[in-house]
Amino acid sequence: MQRWWSVALCTLLVLVVVPAQAQEMPPLIETLSLVLPAVDAPPGDTPPGSWSGVLFYSDWETMLNVRGVSARPADFDELDTMPDEVSDLYSAATLFSLANTPALAELVVLDAGVTGFDLRSLGQIVVTGDPPDDALLIRGNFNLEAFIEARTAAGFVVERETRTSAWGGFGAAVLCSAEGCDQGRMIDPANRRVGDPLYGNLGQRSPIYAREDLVFATRDEIHFNRGVGVIEGERESLMDDPLFRTAAEAISADLTVMQAMFTFPRVIGAVSDSIAMANIGAPNLDALLAEAEATFTPIPAYEILAFGSGVRGEQVITQIVLVYRNSADAQNAGNIVAERIATAVSLSGNRPWAELLEDRSMILTAPAVFTSETTGLSAAVIEFTAPLPTTIRLAEESQDRPAPSDEGYLLLVRGLNMRDLGFLAISF
């Protein structure tokens, strides 16, 4: 009997001292932990070494996986040689679902011989800021030697290089143009390279930080050095900002995230701005503004705005996330925004938003409040749900091809670019 108790006690002690498995960090939060914090500044007024404006996040591998795409071509030229049903689904999951940014557009014509990597390397992609202060971060699997070889062949110089450490750290390289790391803004149209997302549209050659698991580039040297400091764990990241952290946690709480967008309220503008832009030169503009102002219901001022797109079960979920200091304001805002969406008219398309959602088989659900255990802040979460597309939805527009995965997300991003999201405006 005494021996039995001894064995039981030893077993109990073993159970007590075994640590719990650490919870895996969602890819969205893990990726944004490598991004420099943002500042809220109008275009042209961004402090040196900073970024402002909009952050776009896309998870290339997840976008393929949620549609069951098994093809992994090196580039879109190789994709064109595959059967139509394969290439069409791949394109629907990625190309036609991506938010429209210049860096991501270059992926369509990506040339591995120029870049040193191909589409099979891509994992998560982040584009931050307004040009010329924008930056690109790509996580994935890269052959560092091939990357360095391709860049040096293009006239880049290796400024710093470290090999993988004995304890498993990442080897890294810093590459700059022959003119120097401080010349990333230098315009050289004759040097523009189509198919290279790390080059500027006017031939600018950004300094580049490369490892086997990521590539980072931005034209501003101060921004570049600070961004490298974040990646190497020497500086605070965007996820140390409680506002952005709350938004990212709200999006990734129960979604397999495909894409996300983060920005400041000023980007939305006022309701009157949207109406004026949609009715330039209209003789009854004053009457339209007066009518809209009479029915305008204000919402509490939010701190951060985010859009999220992901999959939950067999549903594609599109989210609008508004971050607040307290849950009461978040609840109030969620209710008002949901009511606005139900009655709002898209000024660019002159159609009710309810019809635009219905066209895409999207349903507006009851708003919810998310409260972060990490930050203590809250967020209003407004969701649209739709079936995961497998066949045609808008045959006359898609030419009998599979529908994009992220139609709701693209609708919101398009509205953001066109100042057509008056239902999210704080002021008239």
Task: Locate predicted features.
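Sec/Tat signal peptide C-region and signal peptidase I cleavage site
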Residues: 18-22
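Positively charged n-region of N-terminal signal peptides that target proteins for export
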Residues: 1-4
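Soluble, non-membrane globular domain cores that form compact, hydrophobic packing
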Residues: 23-133, 139-428
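Bacterial N-terminal signal peptides
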Residues: 7-16
